[in-house]
Amino acid sequence: MKSIKSAGDRFFAVIAYIIVILSIMSTTVMWNYLKGAFIPIGTYRYLLLAISLLLVLVTNSYNFKDLSFITLIICYLLVFIFFSQINPFKYFSTFCMPLTASLLIVFVYYQHGKGNLLLASYANIVLIVAGVSLFFYFFGSILGLRIGAIDTNYYWADNPHFTTSYCYLYFHQPLQDQIYLGHHVIRNTGIFTEAPGYTLFLLDGLIIELFVKKSKTFWRIGLILVTLLTTLSATAILLGALAVLISFLQYLQAQGKLNLKIVIPVFLLLLVLGVIVIRIRKSGGSSYSVRVDDLRIGLTLWSQNPVFGVGFGNEGALIKMFAFHRANNGLSMGLTTLMATGGLYLALYFLVPFFTTLFAPSRRYLLPISILLLLEIIISNISTNPVYLMAMALLWYAVLNDIREQGAFAGTNYTSLYF
């Protein structure tokens, strides 16, 4: 990122860090679930919406095309209310509000040519969290050094659980530990309640480092990859490996050394092996059973109402179909959850950018990002996650600008100019 010189740059940089922090705080970070936590998660979403509206007013960002698109999306979301059995408050507070805020923030930043500040602030925070978690993971969880350690409780799905906090910057979750090949294995969950939440946080940082930044910084990429390995999430590790592989293939293509006759069969073989590894890795545990049950429930409910689903926030319809007791009332797979409760209508917001990038002039740059974001929502229930919604807003902006200016990304500084 270029050095920040003007007052305007400093303003956008500071606000970018505030936006990223609020977005992360709106997710499943431990501070929201500790005993005595007094700030509701919804508060951060309201603050994000307030900041987005203030940004539009303060910066005079009234681009007709951009605001028309955002208005169209808002109207599209409102129409859903009239055709679906819906929990209005939950729909507005957990989906419409953060989605609208994300679109406004992204469009304001890129209209003023400051979009790189949003991406840089997120990437920097990921690096800080990863570095801190690795330090406490090795010296605290593995070696047993109680550096600023405090034993406390947190509440997940309304049930109390034990955790050890290290200076409130890293949390060892015994509930997340696993038995692998007869050995007790400790997972690095960072500042999150569960390893999957942490892995997605890291993966988004990896996407920025590999596909958004024009120049690669290998120590940053290495730090994220090492941290991903310590989460012991087979799915996330394979996604990280896939991201690195795609980035390497892009490099070979740029050097004119890419032989598709060799690469495509190898790529398909690795993909099949990856699926087999996940199948074997999870088949012995409850995680696999839950995902199979989720797939069954999601497809069954979606078949009942393919267009609008059974109703956003309709947990009763989900609970009635559970094959066994769970710790929470939701599904773990994002796309099937969205299809079941919001139908194809809401799912289109996440699917359209992916299919558009297949034909975009600069699909070479956009398609890897689009594929990885699509895989994220398939494997994890993150359709209301403000960080993920921000990533989708960035993808929408990149796609729309590429359509407006044919070949806009070709031969340009992809990182600093657009996405």
PLM feature spans:
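A membrane-periplasm/extracellular boundary helix in multi-pass inner-membrane enzymes
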Residues: 135-144, 247-287
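Alpha-helical transmembrane segments of multi-pass inner-membrane proteins
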Residues: 120-143, 166-231, 239-249
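Helix-loop-helix junctions and helix-breaking kinks within/between transmembrane helices
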Residues: 34-42, 82-99, 188-200, 218-248, ...
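Hydrophobic transmembrane alpha-helices and their immediate junctions
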Residues: 213-225, 241-249, 341-377
